[in-house]
Amino acid sequence: MIFLKAPRVKTAALFAAILLVVLFSSCKGKAGGFGAGRDVYERMRNTTYEVKFNFPGLERQPDHDMVIRAFNDKLTEMGYPGLSIRLDSSDWASWMDRSSALVLSGGDYDLVYAPIMTPFYADAMAGGAWLPWDSYIDLVPEFAELLAPWREYLYVWGADTKEKHIYRIPNIKEYASYRCEARWNKNVAERLGITEQLRNIKNVYEFEPYLEMYKNVYGNNGMAVLAVDSYKLVDCFMLGAFNSFLDSVYDVNTDSYLNYAFSPWFDEYIALTRSWYAKGYIPAYQQTELIDDLSMKFGPESFLVYFNEGKPGGEAEMNQNAKGRYEMGTTYLTPAFVDFNSLMGVAWGLNARSKNPEAAAFLFGLLSSNKELTNLINFGIEGVHYNLDSNGVAVRTVPSQYYSNLLWMLGNRFLCHRLPGEPENLSELYQEFNNNAVKFPNFGFQEPGEEAWKGVDRDMYKGVLGALRTQYQRSIEIGTLSDADLADIRRRLTQANYQQIDAVLNREYAAYKGSNEN
């Protein structure tokens, strides 16, 4: 087992979010702002423009149009009668498909949900499709003071020139980090009398006696381990690793970059999942079923545990998704840690082709700073799609015709209503979570520009990497790689000179550390 060794630090994200809320709230309804760029509010009051968001799947909500109309009516009430939004994804139906990255480089959208997690996506968008961060700040000068603390959280890939770098708008999230968790079925734990034992587990191996207990009681009718999330067990060995899928990844234990497929923690993960399949903890039929198909079959005691990343208050959201079939408990397997992918995985891109980027930037800021707008887009219309109970908790109507599932990626989570089961002191829990988060030594290091890669055939490497992901990604996710599969992966990566990729990253990272020592 590889354990985390990085020091603890405080993060700035929580305070940036609070600052954004306070400052924007102070100017709500006023013509002015708070500084040299205050005239932007007057311009927006006299601007007519529809800001078009591309958000995957929202148009499938039956009351989508009703909520958007209510949102635009609210903008008029706030003094911006010419501003409106449109959220759809008519040409981005398969948004998780890698080929959909090509859509991001064109189209007439002003703002696009842009979970660009790998250089593959960056290559598809290179060429100036997105406005640089500084340009976004310049569009609405008031944002400079508000959003400056977010600069260190920008994950940037791209070419050498500033114009081709991919900068994105960071979302105002409720946390700047996450931790690796085991989530377990409270119904089962209580029946087996193991609730406290599960809460006190320190690593994945300590689950085995309870997995064996579950299998002995439920046999083939249950799932001791839910396999479709088991690939996230890798994060219990090497934090952040599962996002890389065979590419180079930062190893906090050696403070260096190495390839995913050649790392000792990957071997450990493969050995563990093979063992769990052999012992019957993960039923073989899970290898052929998708999570959505399996979840439709879940009953109150269908499984014992699965693994994921999490945050404070996460149990409430999980229980809501379970729709009363079971309740979840959580065991924390790692400290909270700041991770670029987690921070920027919900970012939005501002299209350089926007006909009015100032209006788009302004409206995004408005959405992220106004409580009514944030809750409208996330919950729908109060009294229609949800009601607030006596404690101010949002209880969705049944059945609700609007369930956006945007809480984690659009709006300001600090301004959102609480969900059933979330504690009243949730903001304080977030603050504690962030204050105790680990910040890796490589935080802020960006992939080197083209000059650093001279003499390295990255196109060939990326081609091999893409082919391997297509062939083996699902096997990696569910932990079913054979010896022959693993040998094939390593042989092809070696032929593609993965060592050169690691060498360049480590050379440039060493230079980065040297330049930042003072």
Task: Cite the ranges covered by each PLM segment.
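Extracytoplasmic/secretory soluble proteins
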Residues: 2-4, 11, 15-518
